[in-house]
Amino acid sequence: MEYKKVAFALGKDKPKLTIDYTQVDFADAPARLAFIDSKLFGVPFQGYDYYLDGKGGMKGVLAKLFQLFNQTGEQMDKADLVTYLAEIVFLPEALLQDFVSFTQIDAHTVEARISCNSVSASGVFRFDDACEMICFSTNERGQTASDGSVEEIPWEAQCDAYKLYSDGIKRPTIFRAVWKYPEEDFIYFDGSISSVDGAEVRR
């Protein structure tokens, strides 16, 4: 899945960037790779976000030489597992795997649970009257700062503007990631999807 010119922020009080974002998700096991390409104060900045073999992490490098952060550990393992769950609607074949389960709450709400290597996480999907997923919310994705500290903030992934792609599948064209602070919502990722598995939005 590819995004172009995403509005992105490294933190609530951190610089805002415009990034290109490319990610690959896998269906046979919870796994994802994501690459960020941008500039920070005019200097090339790359980021790498991953969840592989039950381990998650995020690394940021400036000028291809200087490591700004390298976040790993149990909190990142769970955070990236939750991220995979939030994005699972883009990978329908993963919905049928044994590592994920669903419980319907009502006509518009489904609770989802995912497990990998003894780590479990859950969240709630909400759907509109057209059965389109509009958001995924969870209290199980801690916010890890660049210094490694963790703050427990409700997190939400939002999907919007569903359109047909060139492969005939209707998908969201807008994806946002939001921290739900008590005083305000902080959207740190606000992107338009340019393609999914090579399929582009029909014009």
Regions found by a protein language model. Name each.
Residues D13-T18, L96, D106-H108, V119, ...:
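Residues that act as N-cap/strand-start positions at coil-to-secondary-structure junctions
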Residues V61-S118:
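Flexible, processing/modification-adjacent segments and terminal tails
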Residues E2-L10, R32-K39, V110-N117, T138, ...:
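Short beta-strand segments that buttress and anchor functional surface loops
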Residues R113-E200:
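Gly/Pro-enriched, hydrophobic low-complexity segments
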Residues M1-Q67:
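N-terminal mature ectodomain segment of secretory-pathway/periplasmic proteins
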Residues Y21-L33, G47-K59, I105-H108, R126-I134, ...:
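Short, solvent-exposed coil/turn segments at beta-strand boundaries
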